[in-house]
Amino acid sequence: MLRHTVMWRFHEQAEGAEKGVNIEKAKALLLSCAHVVPGIRAFVVATATPGMDCTHDVVLHMLVDDAQVLAAYQNHPQHVAIKPFMKAVVQERCCMDFVV
C-alpha cells in the first residue's frame, strides 16, 4: 500500500474569489475524484481548523494499493482537469508519498 499526502497553502485572493471560497471549491473538486480509479482505499480531504496552528489550508490523504493506482489517479482526466484551478489559487504545495 502507498500513502499519498498533499498539502496546499492558498493565496488570500485568486481567480476573483477570496481564499475561503477557493478552499471550499478546491475541497469539492478534490472530493469529486475520490472514486475515479479502482484501488483507492481511503481518500480524505480536510481544511485547516480556525484557531489551530496550521501551516497549510487544505490536506489530501490517500491510501492506494500501489504506485500504479496512484499514477492512474494522477493521470485520470477528472484529476487533470482540476490542476489549472489549483495552480491558480495555490501559493505553495507540498507532497509526500510513502509505502505503508
For each feature predicted by the language model, list its residue ranges.
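Short S/T/G/P-rich N-terminal loop/turn motif that feeds into the first structured element of a domain
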Residues: 1-57, 65-71, 99-100
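C-terminal structural segments of small proteins and small subunits
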Residues: 64-89
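Interfacial aromatic-anchored transmembrane helix boundaries in multi-pass membrane proteins
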Residues: 91-96
